[in-house]
Amino acid sequence: MSRYRGPKLRITRRLGALPGLTQKQSKKKGRPGQHGKSNEADNSKKTTEYGIRLEEKQKLKFNYGLTESQLYRYIKEARRRKGVTGLILLQLLEMRLDTICFTLGFAPTIASARQLVNHGHITVNDNVVSIPSFQCQINDVIGIKPKATSKNLVEGNLQTIKQVDLPTHLKFDKSKQEATVINYCDRNELLLNLDELLVIEYYSRR
């Protein structure tokens, strides 16, 4: 399945805030497609066990901009590793290069961070990496390609994006405009409101 490229606010009206997808908020009330009608039937559908798990899975998929096959590969990798599967899944996604660039404020969304990486503007340990899904490791240094075009693009984003406190697994050096990965992400610092256990349960029969 291809990556979603439709209206972002339609998704956030249905699933709630997805910081990796968009920072904008819809002025419309209710879920898309209701047109002012009662949402009793919709709520009934939503509250089935399958419906709840599906919605949590969709949150993860849209927030990180993944295809269904990509998400399932991360699920399988998280299962393979020792530890709490749900936490490992989130750590894998947060260690993606495009996610880290978004978290640092190099780009306003994960989708735009993906383009930033694709176009060769980002370095890892002084080497240009153009693979958005690249798995960063502890002690990796994430920087900007030393060219005016790259620096102007990222610095412009850093000045305009409303940056919240940086999570503790990243350390940013403003003077060098680079960040060091110092740990795996802390579950309590993630901006996405999600029950990852329900995502794991959704895929439990696959």
From Swiss-Prot:
GO terms for cellular component: chloroplast; small ribosomal subunit. Its main location: plastid. InterPro entries: Ribosomal_uS4 (IPR022801), Ribosomal_uS4_bac-type (IPR005709), Ribosomal_uS4_CS (IPR018079), Ribosomal_uS4_N (IPR001912), S4_RNA-bd (IPR002942), S4_RNA-bd_sf (IPR036986). Residues 1-13, 25-34 have a biased composition (Basic residues). Residues 95-157 form the S4 RNA-binding domain. Gene3D superfamilies: Ribosomal Protein S4 Delta 41, Chain A, domain 1 (1.10.1050.10), RNA-binding S4 domain (3.10.290.10). GO terms for biological process: ribosomal small subunit biogenesis; translation. Part of the 30S ribosomal subunit. Contacts protein S5. The interaction surface between S4 and S5 is involved in control of translational fidelity. One of the primary rRNA binding proteins, it binds directly to 16S rRNA where it nucleates assembly of the body of the 30S subunit. This is Small ribosomal subunit protein uS4c.
